[in-house]
Amino acid sequence: MGIRKYKPTTPGRRGASVSDFAEITRSTPEKSLVRPLHGKGGRNAHGRITTRHKGGGHKRAYRVIDFRRHDKDGVNAKVAHIEYDPNRTANIALLHYLDGEKRYIIAPQGLKQGDVIESGANADIKPGNNLPLRNIPAGTVIHAVELRPGGGAKLARSAGVSIQLLGKEGTYAALRMPSGEIRRVDVRCRATVGEVGNAEQSNINWGKAGRMRWKGKRPTVRGVVMNPVDHPHGGGEGKTSGGRHPVSPWGKPEGRTRKPNKPSDKLIVRRRRTGKKR
């Protein structure tokens, strides 16, 4: 993937860039693997906003991605196309299995149209192949990793990210996450070899607020510029700093969104670096 920069013909185009989509081989998705996607605009069943800054955006169709692949062990698949997916940062690959079935997977770096990949304990260690962690050698770069055996890929699915398999001891494998955290995972969990493709996606400069609106992201207004009725930081004469520790519009302290006693925390060997003073 490359990035194409625009000439500054308008203020919105100045500094803006876009993917050149050089890896994409087809522009329309496989019809049998597409489902309707209805935007909720951040509202719950009562119509109240539960997630702010969401709404609008271009109409999308959901591409059904195979995050398990365990039921296709031993069946080779040919990469028919590399496609764009508006619902994620990574590209997706359309696989044609020898038994006639078609499925989408996350497209790893280096996977090309015409490549043949497989899944199963005896699969080769090459990008796109899916194996249990117990069958992957230490030091291998992987992505789309399960947290529970058979639960489907949960980790490292975004563009350009990867996990390194550090080693195996007993029934657990040690993984270095993209955040730097080292975590133990059951060796029966499956992973796909290679790193996720479309790595340059993080370098795209969106250029203008309108492109964010196309993605369904609404403006984020600071509390200190609101009125007292709208936010605890609002009001004051002239510009003020809020006069209190940062809080949400409902008065809850900012941050601290993680559950302090998660059962899976016991599997963390080394925590990620946050840059915060403890």
UniProtKB/Swiss-Prot annotation:
Signal peptide: none annotated. NCBIfam families: rplB_bact (TIGR01171). Belongs to the universal ribosomal protein uL2 family. Residues 37-58, 269-278 have a biased composition (Basic residues). One of the primary rRNA binding proteins. Required for association of the 30S and 50S subunits to form the 70S ribosome, for tRNA binding and peptide bond formation. It has been suggested to have peptidyltransferase activity; this is somewhat controversial. Makes several contacts with the 16S rRNA in the 70S ribosome. It comes from Mycolicibacterium smegmatis (strain ATCC 700084 / mc(2)155). This is Large ribosomal subunit protein uL2. GO terms for molecular function: rRNA binding; structural constituent of ribosome; transferase activity. The gene is rplB. InterPro entries: NA-bd_OB-fold, Rib_uL2_dom2, Ribosomal_uL2, Ribosomal_uL2_bac/org-type, Ribosomal_uL2_C, Ribosomal_uL2_CS, Ribosomal_uL2_dom3, Ribosomal_uL2_RNA-bd_dom. Residues 253-268 have a biased composition (Basic and acidic residues). Residues 1-20, 25-58, 223-278 are annotated as: Disordered. One of its GO terms (biological process) is cytoplasmic translation. HAMAP family: Ribosomal_uL2_B (MF_01320_B). Part of the 50S ribosomal subunit. Forms a bridge to the 30S subunit in the 70S ribosome. GO terms for cellular component: large ribosomal subunit. Keywords: Ribonucleoprotein, Ribosomal protein, RNA-binding, rRNA-binding. SMART domains: Ribosomal_L2 (SM01383), Ribosomal_L2_C (SM01382).
